[in-house]
């Protein structure tokens, strides 16, 4: 009926700046005797905020800033910088302390990801005679000439003359429109925060996916365990030495000597950290060399262009040069790491194992039920948004096991997931290669396989055996074409419902900069030219010159 039920103010870093400034404005508006006094109060507030932001402890504990945070604003602030994790877009490591410090990504950098039409920076012109007169009223600047003032007065301490207002407002409005564009382009990301907040009685309006996962996990785990948050939060399990004897599952077995030797070596391995340099082994199966590390399995791929040569509707496939036609399958393990946690009861030592693993299994099953449900709304949340929410929480769990400042920290649990995940995939690769079914590529949660018609039944038999022995579930999708630079950067065309569906990853994804706003904008035209060249037979220069 046109009645306003709430007012929400969207901004970029408004959680740490704009909201505090508005609180100061409303607080001092009736307590100052003149506009000049009010402006001075706001100026001092702004300086306090800016000077404190590099010192996290000071920013959190400052009495004045905390009083502003407690001020009841007449609107709800929504910070898109936080929602898209742009306040922690990258990390730098302190050379002296080794501390990892988050680095924010500014609105201008983000606007490049959006391909915003106008990239603006605004700088005040040099101080002129008219402005110089104003500084004569400031004791420590009185009597200085224009050159001296331009050297001494910081740009944030300048007076704003009337003639500066119009270009400054144009610049400010451009910033506002960029924020509006972020909200317009990513409505589901924004809507999900409202839906989650309402359905689960939490506040995630200013939370990134990772923070949202933390908040929901806290709520879900407390329900499953029967423990209040204060009874389990704030704990972690420290490890000094981690023996793989305590890590490897008993069903991990190999048939070939090379892999048996690898397994024996792993049983004798002890590591003291879980970073990238802590552990690495190479092993060859057939023609493919695989690298095992603390993060996940990778095959050492060479650049390749491959096509399934079996017929597919009216789509042309390259000649098999007289050989037998074959199909490339992508054997993808569903939610691999969370599945290992749930099926094989992997949990931090300080957490209730049954409650933790039952929660993981419940979320996985709930997500499957949601995806296949015919209902538009489930638990008061739109079906697609609920599926996204569950995916966010499920996929975050593994990462939380290795986050030192989190409540799930236990590095042995990390190794149980990653090491066994890799060994499981190697069991599958070995079994397939022993039956002359050749692996094309292997990554953390799946493999690509070349299968001839005569091998179809054997392929299904081996993959079914593998799923039964590991407890994992997987799907085999047909790959029409694979264009790969290496294992992490590729273009894939999948055969689906009589059509071709393109999926790209890494440097060969021309839209990566828009899928993840924290990423840099790195020559997407190159990825587009590669895609057009291989999939549309379009010369590279035609793409570049368009």
Predicted regions and their residues:
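Conserved acidic
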Residues: 2-546
